[in-house]
C-alpha cells in the first residue's frame, strides 16, 4: 500500500460561454502548445456549425448527447498470469469514459482531410450525434474486443 495520500482532483471552472465543466475539459483537450484562445475559437465555431446543421436550439445539449454516444462501457486491459498475457475485459470508470470519448472525437476530427479543424470537429460531432462515423466505430471495436475476451473476465483484479 502506498503511504502517500491520493492526489486531489483539480476543480476546473466552467467555460465562459456555456458555463459547462465538460466543455471546458474538451477545450483543454483540443488545446495544443498552451494556445487556449485558439482552442476555444475552434470548439465554439464547431459547436455553432454543429447546431446549425442539425437545427438545434442549444448546442451544448447536442454536444453532450454526441459525447454520450461515443463513451465506451467496456474495454480490455492486459493482465499477466503465469507466462501468458490475457486481454481482460473491464468496465470503464465514468471519468475515463468521457476522457476516452473526447480523445477519440478529437483524434478522428484531426485526421479528417482538409485544413480547418473547426469543420472536421463539427462533422465528427454530427457523426457521433447520429451514431455513426469513425469515433462510434472505435467504440464498437472496443466493445467487440471486450466481448471476444469475455472468457477471461474472471481474471479481474
From Swiss-Prot:
Taxonomy, superkingdom: Bacteria
Keyword Chloroplast in record: no
Single GO MF descriptor: structural constituent of ribosome
UniProt keyword annotation of RNA-binding present: yes
Provenance organism: Chlamydia trachomatis serovar D (strain ATCC VR-885 / DSM 19411 / UW-3/Cx)
PANTHER family: RIBOSOMAL PROTEIN S7
Family assignment from sequence similarity: Belongs to the universal ribosomal protein uS7 family.
Gene: rpsG
Keywords of the record: Ribonucleoprotein, Ribosomal protein, RNA-binding, rRNA-binding, tRNA-binding
Protein task: One of the primary rRNA binding proteins, it binds directly to 16S rRNA where it nucleates assembly of the head domain of the 30S subunit. Is located at the subunit interface close to the decoding center, probably blocks exit of the E-site tRNA.
GO annotation, cellular component aspect: cytosolic small ribosomal subunit; ribosome
One Pfam family named in its UniProt record: Ribosomal_S7
Name of the featured protein: Small ribosomal subunit protein uS7
InterPro entries for the chain: Ribosomal_uS7, Ribosomal_uS7_bac/org-type, Ribosomal_uS7_CS, Ribosomal_uS7_dom, Ribosomal_uS7_dom_sf
Quaternary state and interactors: Part of the 30S ribosomal subunit. Contacts proteins S9 and S11.
Biological process according to GO: ribosomal small subunit assembly; translation
Amino acid at each position: 500500500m502506498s503511504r502517500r495520500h491520493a492526489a486531489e482532483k483539480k476543480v476546473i471552472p466552467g467555460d465562459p460561454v456555456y458555463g459547462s465543466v465538460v466543455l471546458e475539459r474538451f477545450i483543454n483537450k483540443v488545446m495544443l502548445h498552451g494556445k487556449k484562445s485558439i482552442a476555444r475559437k475552434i470548439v465554439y465555431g464547431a459547436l455553432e456549425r454543429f447546431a446549425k446543421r442539425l437545427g438545434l436550439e442549444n448546442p451544448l445539449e447536442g454536444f453532450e448527447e454526441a459525447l454520450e454516444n461515443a463513451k465506451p462501457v467496456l474495454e480490455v486491459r492486459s493482465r499477466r498470469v503465469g507466462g501468458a498475457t490475457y486481454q481482460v475485459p473491464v468496465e470503464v470508470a465514468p471519468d475515463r469514459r468521457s476522457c476516452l470519448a473526447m480523445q477519440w472525437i478529437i483524434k478522428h476530427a484531426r485526421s479528417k482531410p482538409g485544413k480547418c479543424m473547426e469543420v472536421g470537429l463539427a462533422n465528427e460531432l454530427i457523426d457521433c450525434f447520429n451514431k455513426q462515423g469513425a469515433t462510434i466505430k472505435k467504440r464498437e471495436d472496443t466493445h467487440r474486443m471486450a466481448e471476444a475476451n469475455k472468457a477471461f473476465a474472471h481474471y479481474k483484479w
